[in-house]
Amino acid sequence: LVERMEQAAGRTRGSLSRAAVDALYGSRVSMSASRMDKFKSCHFSYFVQYGLKAETRKKAGFQAPEYGTFVHYVLEHVFQSETWRDEEGGVDGDKLDALTDEIVERYIREELGGLAEETPRLRYLFQRLLKPVRAVVRNVAEELSASDFKPIAFELGFGSGKDLPPVELSVDGMTVSISGFVDRVDGWVKDGRLNLRVVDYKTGRKSFDLTDVWNGMGLQMLLYLFTLQKEGKDLFGGHEIDPAGVLYLPARDAVIAGSRTMTEAARRQAVDK
């Protein structure tokens, strides 16, 4: 133990040579939003994950990433049409629930091949998911019904071979190419100009923090928004584009602390935090 402590004490912190960095990552680095945030938050963690490609052993089951994919699928397919609206343009709850159930069944059939061969645990899990997914869809529908913005694109890709080119930045002589997807793009035409907002569904607990943006993290939605302003004219009917903002929407049915006297408005405000 003493020998190991002496060895550790004699070690010095160094850095990789430029030749080693080029050999490891190349001179053109393709970055996703999560990779960019990982690099800004901890260089060593980035090196271990994306340089050494070390991975933790994953447990079998329907984990958070799979749940996020499932919810994104439901939201995308529900809001590709306007059939959930009532005659006044508001939310028809019965139509919305029926459409949500239909999309969930489609996901189970097309993405999972049905549940007949799955474990009883997974079948039970999907039965339990229906109620919270309905609540998530209802929350998104009510936000849309109160807005002049309408969905005009879903899962919009940035990168080679996708809907729009990647976001490219030059850093220390290297070209960083950022690729990824925007969950939803909403548009509103006013005075002949197209106002765009990008929508990010939050299935986890991560929230938007302006301090992160100041420190170079959590920039992806803003980068995508300004890339849409620059590159999206031909994609959206030739309108001149104005960036209207970034909207982070909770895509989970959170359990909140409350009381019997809590109003519906107060409950929704707590859920949206």
Task: Show where each model-derived region lies.
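Structural signature of nuclease core domains in nucleic-acid processing machines
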Residues: L1-K273
